[in-house]
């Protein structure tokens, strides 16, 4: 049974991402036979939980120039106008509000707006709340994992090359994976 935003451990306040214990990664079909993977090294996430859960907000920003696939030439190509066009669009953002967040136990669904290369489209993130704890240092922490599938063409990321054997170098569907730990601000 799906509930509202309220979760048994719902706590009002401002939560900030703990970058050392968090990650944003992606994968996309490559050469029609495997997947290429990468990460974004610099990002920020702020969640403001409200007394009125529908007024809760999630705001995330990603420095797209921080893309890292482990191959410098590919990373530079991803930063170019063929892909992220970081000189003109240095930041990718995601925003969501409480009326678009639902829980079913620890499982959640978030519908929000992703903006990439100046183009905004709604996306759906599904995931699981890992828990909420009081850490040994006097902080309240929450952890969650989630994923979303986006079509890169929707955001004007259309570069591709035909393969001699048929098909294309890159698939259109990109899976974005989130592994986040957030800390309640005092």
Model-derived features: positions:
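Low-complexity, acidic/polar, glycine-enriched regions of mature
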Residues: 1-186
């Amino acid at each position: 049974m799906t509930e509202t935003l309220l979760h048994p451990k719902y706590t009002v306040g401002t939560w900030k991402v703990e970058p050392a214990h968090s990650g944003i990664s992606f994968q996309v079909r490559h050469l029609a036979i495997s997947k290429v993977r990468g990460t974004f090294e610099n990002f920020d996430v702020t969640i403001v939980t409200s007394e009125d859960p529908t007024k809760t907000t999630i705001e995330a920003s990603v420095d797209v120039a921080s893309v890292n696939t482990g191959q410098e030439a590919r990373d530079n190509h991803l930063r170019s106008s063929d892909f992220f066009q970081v000189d003109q669009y240095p930041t990718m953002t995601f925003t969501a509000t409480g009326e678009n967040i639902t829980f079913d136990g620890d499982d959640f669904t978030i519908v929000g707006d992703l903006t990439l290369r100046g183009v905004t489209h709604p996306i759906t993130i599904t995931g699981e709340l890992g828990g909420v704890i009081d850490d040994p240092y006097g902080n309240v922490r929450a952890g969650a994992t989630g994923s979303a599938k986006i079509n890169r063409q929707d955001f004007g990321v259309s570069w591709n090359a035909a393969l001699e054997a048929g098909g294309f170098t890159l698939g259109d569907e990109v899976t974005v994976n989130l592994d986040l730990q957030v800390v309640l601000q005092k």
